């Protein structure tokens, strides 16, 4: 580890338990893994809870890199400060924090949070407000927040923000596919607080839950007339769509729902070009961890070079999100406590991969 200020009364161990990729990206539990490297710009966090996200199994499945620690969203307690942060006063040892990291990162293999300790970028880590429990804090995490900053502001180009909402005259309708997912309920809140009108697509069984986050209208994707119904409701003028799922059937529905003049389709997964059938619709893939400003060393369209401007935007965005957390305006997704520690994470990953989770965020206690 780099020189850092640590909690002297509790010396850090030399090894930890972590979930790490093996050959072919197969994830397994290791009990003698090294602690993550603490760079000057990072803080070391003793993990209390982790959230399980679809990206956690997808990263290992699609981009197998033996040695990578998996896991993105966490909450925990600061136990060491990188040299850049040791004297700033922004963080101190013992602080309760939450955030998101680029787990299963081929060029930073020790960073994942499915471990006893995680090394987190301090500028993209939140202080947990006093009113919030650590389980809910893990559900907030940071991955979705960063992704939506890039998606709503830079990809869809929406005006306004929760800090500075647009007036009614500038409000636009935004379709959120998979509105009952954690990204969906977060997007719905941010859109509503920014002055816009979030329209959700999800299963009818989750309508009441999504409405409670601010959706103005909901449509059931099971309906054979879902796209036509959306076009009718929006008077054929819909021009902004967010699709966290980005499978062929979701892309088809979103393209069919888009208004006559077209618009922007923001995908959070790589999209198949053959389903992007309308020239007036401009598709774009957003990779959430690009908000950190570093290189994304993946492939299949997810790769990107370092972009310092995204980091500048991201720091400002996270500062605004901290304000929302502190004021209690930002709600986390409904939590489903999942037992079993590291074994529980492995079981939870299987449930997500086999699509057995709906309208809930799986949270596992580690510390």
UniProtKB/Swiss-Prot annotation:
SUPFAM superfamilies found in the cross-reference section: GroES-like, NAD(P)-binding Rossmann-fold domains
Documented EC number(s): 1.-.-.-
UniProt pathway annotation: Mycotoxin biosynthesis
Class of enzymatic activity (EC top level): oxidoreductase
Keyword entries, A-Z: NADP, Nucleotide-binding, Oxidoreductase
Residue numbers binding substrate: 143-150, 288-292
Keyword Translocase listed: no
Binding, NADP(+): 55-58, 203-206, 221, 268-269, 357-358
GO molecular function, one term: trans-2-enoyl-CoA reductase (NADPH) activity
UniProt entry tagged with the keyword Translocase: no
Pfam families: ADH_N (PF08240)
Subunit field text: Monomer.
Similarity remark: Belongs to the zinc-containing alcohol dehydrogenase family.
Stated role: Trans-enoyl reductase; part of the gene cluster that mediates the biosynthesis of the cytotoxic leucine-containing cytochalasans, including aspochalasin C, aspochalasin E, TMC-169, flavichalasine F, aspergillin PZ, aspochalasin M and flavichalasine G. The first step in the pathway is catalyzed by the hybrid PKS-NRPS ffsA that utilizes 8 units of malonyl-CoA to iteratively assemble the octaketide chain before addition of L-leucine by the C-terminal NRPS modules. Because ffsA lacks a designated enoylreductase (ER) domain, the required activity is provided the enoyl reductase fssC.
Name of the protein described by the UniProt record: Trans-enoyl reductase ffsC
Organism whose genome encodes this protein: Aspergillus flavipes
């Amino acid at each position: 580890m780099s020189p850092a200020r640590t909690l002297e009364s509790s010396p850090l161990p030399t090894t930890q338990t972590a979930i790490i990729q093996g050959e072919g990206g197969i994830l397994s539990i290791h009990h003698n893994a090294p602690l993550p490297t603490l760079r000057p710009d990072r803080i070391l966090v003793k993990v209390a809870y982790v959230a399980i996200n679809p990206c956690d199994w997808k990263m290992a499945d699609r981009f197998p890199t033996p040695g990578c620690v998996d896991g993105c969203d966490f909450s925990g307690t600061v136990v060491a400060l990188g040299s850049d942060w040791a004297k700033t006063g922004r963080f101190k040892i013992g602080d309760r924090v939450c955030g998101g990291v680029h787990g299963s990162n081929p060029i930073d293999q020790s960073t994942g949070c499915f471990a006893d300790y995680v090394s987190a970028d301090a500028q993209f880590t939140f202080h947990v407000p006093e009113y919030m429990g650590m389980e809910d804090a893990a559900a907030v995490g940071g991955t979705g927040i960063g992704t939506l900053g890039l998606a709503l502001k830079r990809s869809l180009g929406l005006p306004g923000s929760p800090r500075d909402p647009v007036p009614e005259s500038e409000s636009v309708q935004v379709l959120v596919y998979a509105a009952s997912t954690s990204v969906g309920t977060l997007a719905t809140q941010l859109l509503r607080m920014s002055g816009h009108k979030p329209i959700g697509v999800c299963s009818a069984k989750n309508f009441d839950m999504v409405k409670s986050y601010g959706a103005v209208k909901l449509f059931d994707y099971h309906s054979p007339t879902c796209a036509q119904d959306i076009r009718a409701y929006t008077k054929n003028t819909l021009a902004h769509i967010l699709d966290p799922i980005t499978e062929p059937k979701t892309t088809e529905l979103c393209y069919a729902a888009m208004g006559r003049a077209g618009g922007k389709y923001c995908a959070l997964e790589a999209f198949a070009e053959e389903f992007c059938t309308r020239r007036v619709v401009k598709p774009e893939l957003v990779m959430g961890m690009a908000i950190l400003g570093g290189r994304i060393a993946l492939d299949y369209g997810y790769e990107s070079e370092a972009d310092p401007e995204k980091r500048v935007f991201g720091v400002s965005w996270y500062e605004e999100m901290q304000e929302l957390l502190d004021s209690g305006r930002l709600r986390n997704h409904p939590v489903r406590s999942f037992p079993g520690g590291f074994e529980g994470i492995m079981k939870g990953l299987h449930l997500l991969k086999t699509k057995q989770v709906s309208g809930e965020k799986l949270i596992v206690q580690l510390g």
